[in-house]
Amino acid sequence: MIESISKIIKYNFKNPQLLNEALTHPSLVSKDTLKFNYERLEFLGDAVLNIVISEMLFNIFPKDTEGNLAKKKTALVCGNKLVEVAQSINLGQFIMMSDGERACGGINNFRNLENALEALIGAIYLDGGFTAAQDFIYLFWEHSATHMNVPPQDAKTILQELVQGKRLPAPAYHTIDKSGPDHNPTFTVEVRIPSYQAIQATGHNKKLAEQKAASLMLNQIHNKTK
């Protein structure tokens, strides 16, 4: 497995245990088995991805305003883009998970793909340093970033316009939980739209959680209309 994914991502781990941790779904972890899963690495990878994408856009678009750069960054780190990259490297087939999670379609679950990809970035960062993580991100994001001629809309805006076109009420966002320490909280937000299943998502701030929830709701709407 390690050799196969290393060829795809064009990076060889010096410490294979980091890769194993990045690909271990929480469902596989118990007191009697593995100690770690990908959640800690996911937290780290999210931060690394954001700084690399920010620097990438800063260099590619020297004349862009802060607002335009922020919109572009949102599009490049949103759930849809993470899933796109994860699917391009067949990441789902490498995620180790419980039989129950796998039976429920875990290898194709968008949230699992997003989390594992961010964990993979975190693992590369710890194993090879910032430059190694930067090279990986540039490999899979630079083309998309370079061709962003028009600042994209964020997921909440796209969802708002979509439901308006369907003559549905505006999406309703509710914060249903806040956990973790004050210096590093995790917010759980739920978005509701009539005729669709409510969607929950988490983030390190309410804005990020709402964007993730909107992105997941967009996926649900698109899948339902196929």
Swiss-Prot record:
CDD domains according to UniProt: DSRM_RNAse_III_family, RIBOc
Protein EC: 3.1.26.3
GO CC, any one term: cytoplasm
Catalytic residues (UniProt): 46, 118
Enzyme class: hydrolase
Localization in the cell: Cytoplasm
Residues reported to bind Mg(2+): 42, 115, 118
Entry keyword annotation includes Repeat: no
Domain named RNase III: residues: 2-129
Keyword Membrane: no
GO MF annotations, alphabetized: double-stranded RNA binding; metal ion binding; ribonuclease III activity; rRNA binding
Keywords: Cytoplasm, Endonuclease, Hydrolase, Magnesium, Metal-binding, mRNA processing, Nuclease, RNA-binding, rRNA processing, rRNA-binding, tRNA processing
Transmembrane annotation, as ranges: none
The DRBM domain, residue ranges: 154-223
Catalysed reactions, semicolon-separated: Endonucleolytic cleavage to 5'-phosphomonoester
Co-factor(s): Mg(2+)
A GO BP annotation: tRNA processing
Protein's job: Digests double-stranded RNA. Involved in the processing of primary rRNA transcript to yield the immediate precursors to the large and small rRNAs (23S and 16S). Processes some mRNAs, and tRNAs when they are encoded in the rRNA operon. Processes pre-crRNA and tracrRNA of type II CRISPR loci if present in the organism.
Quaternary structure annotation from Swiss-Prot or TrEMBL: Homodimer.
Record HAMAP family: RNase_III (MF_00104)
PANTHER family named in the record: RIBONUCLEASE 3, RIBONUCLEASE III
Family according to the record: Belongs to the ribonuclease III family.
Annotated protein name in UniProt: Ribonuclease 3
Source organism of this protein record: Ehrlichia chaffeensis (strain ATCC CRL-10679 / Arkansas)
